Regions:
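Perimembrane helix-loop-helix junctions
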Residues: 102-105, 132-169
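Membrane-interface transmembrane helices that cradle and orient dolichyl/undecaprenyl
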Residues: 51-57, 80, 96-116, 120-123, ...
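C-terminal luminal/periplasmic domains and tails of membrane-associated envelope-modifying transferases
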Residues: 344-355, 359-365, 374-459
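Hydrophobic, aromatic-rich transmembrane alpha-helices
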Residues: 147, 231-254
Length: 459
């Protein structure tokens, strides 16, 4: 069970990709990210095509260019080559937009809102910020005029609203998998969602709620960084094209314009206000909305270009190329073997049955992976991984006792906890130092703690 809010939709799909008969577990889940990014880019292309009339050649060409612009944007590209939830987040946001009955040629069926609700519910089961999609769909069901059925009276509108609600409930029901998984006591079991309090702690993202809208002291610097990111994603030409698509609405349905603007503003404000160093990843849906505007702007340019359409298309492809080449160097992770070298050093250097104390996300997550997946056939299920920063949580201490029943743990965490751990167990105790050349330092079977142990425990 993953860290809050649990990400059940991502975990279900990741388990399917883990069934692939080749590559390491990391490679297989990386393929999920890559496939999601490709899918999101294809949906951007389709959205631009539909917004321009469906079968119009210019709309199709502009859609293809917009899809490539989004797919080659550094942020989406960086998420497509790692095991993370944000590629899938972009795909599900794009799918939710595509499912809304606002596009030319959309079927006038009340089932459309149920389908939209199911996609959006799955998006919520992947990332909680997908909540920004909900007002768009529910508002359309209540007040929209995209479908003739919606104009026939309040009864039809209430049926549409009910369909959307049923679909949402069906998608969000994926969260019910978390207590089932947690009841099996897996080695990684954030929050122990098999209890009511643990489930609520997990799915509401309680540890991170204090970070929401807490970055306002850094507002100006974040706005500057955000503006720089926009240019970095699409280049100066793409930026102008996107603004053209936003401001010049010759073919775009009015309701679609307002929905895209709503999503753009909501995700941008949330990303700027979320007080973490990597909050820029929450801008992906805003970049997606901008990519659709970019495609619409390109369509306007191509219509105005007349006989120069091919020249304009070629120039934009050149601009894409010059934006993508430096991005490729930044996002290329094929030569980054930091986690692999760390895992190899720990697995090969740890004494049999050692207790390994970690303190950060990067060494904790890496060791959880390497303990389970092994390295070149070297599995180390004998190692006991203890994440020091999680020890204040009752659910984590209970999980340790369930996962490692032979290990005696101190009753309560606190100062001298590592010394007490060594006193209670006839096992080597090690600590990871991911920033140092010597990433693992161990003290084997020392009772009472020596000076060297005290140095390690206080590090």
């Amino acid at each position: 069970v993953a860290h809050p809010p649990g990400y059940p939709a991502y975990l279900v799909l990741a388990r399917l990709f883990l069934l692939l008969p080749f590559g390491s577990p990391a490679l297989r889940t990386n393929l999920l990210s890559a496939a999601s990014a490709v899918g999101a880019s294809l949906l951007v292309a389709d959205a631009v095509r539909l917004a321009h009339g469906g079968r119009h050649r210019i709309g199709a060409a502009a859609g293809v260019l917009a899809g490539f612009a989004f797919g080659l944007s550094p942020l989406l590209w960086s998420q497509a080559v790692i095991t993370e939830v944000y590629g899938l987040h972009a795909l599900l946001v794009a799918a939710s937009l595509r499912a809304l009955p606002v596009w030319p040629g959309a079927q006038n069926s009340l089932k459309a809102f149920a389908f939209w609700g199911a996609i959006t519910g799955i998006a919520l089961a992947n990332h909680l910020t997908s909540i920004f999609l909900v007002p768009a769909g529910l508002g359309l069901a209540l007040f929209g005029r995209a479908c003739p059925e919606l104009a026939e009276g309040s009864g039809r509108r209430m049926h549409s609203l009910a369909g959307a609600g049923i679909g949402l409930a069906a998608g969000v029901a994926l969260y019910a998998l978390l207590p089932l998984w947690a009841s099996r006591h897996p080695a990684i079991n954030w929050g122990n969602a098999s209890t009511g309090s643990g489930f609520w702690w997990l799915v509401t993202g309680e540890p991170y709620r204090g970070l929401v809208f807490q970055a306002w002291p850094y507002l100006w610097s974040r706005l500057q960084a955000g503006a720089g990111l926009w240019v970095e994603q699409f280049g100066a030409v793409g930026l102008v094209a996107g603004l053209s698509g936003l401001l010049i609405t010759t073919r775009q349905p009015a309701v679609l314009r307002w929905i895209l603007l709503w999503l753009f503003l909501c995700f941008s404000v949330f990303a700027i206000g979320y007080n973490t160093s990597d909050s820029y990843t929450y801008l992906l849906p805003a970049f997606l909305a901008f990519a659709i505007w970019l495609g619409q702007g390109l369509a306007i340019w191509l219509e105005a270009a007349g006989s120069w359409q091919r020249v304009l298309t070629a120039l934009f492809i050149v601009a894409l190329f010059f934006n993508a080449v430096p991005a490729m160097a930044r996002v290329d992770a094929s030569r980054d073997d930091t986690a692999e070298r760390f895992g190899r050093a720990v697995l090969e250097g740890a004494p049999p049955g050692a207790i390994i104390i970690t303190s950060e996300d990067r060494d904790s997550f890496a060791l959880w992976y390497w303990r389970e997946a092994g390295y070149n056939g070297l599995g180390r299920r004998d190692l006991i991984v203890v994440v020091e920063r999680l020890l204040p949580f009752d659910w984590y201490r209970d999980q340790l006792r369930w996962t490692y029943p032979d290990v005696q743990l101190p009753a309560r965490p606190g100062t001298g906890w590592a010394d007490e751990l060594i006193r209670l167990n006839d096992r080597p105790v090690c600590r990871t130092f991911p920033d140092q050349n010597e990433v693992l330092i161990c003290d084997s079977l020392l009772k009472p703690a020596s000076d060297r142990l005290e140095r390690i425990a206080s590090a």
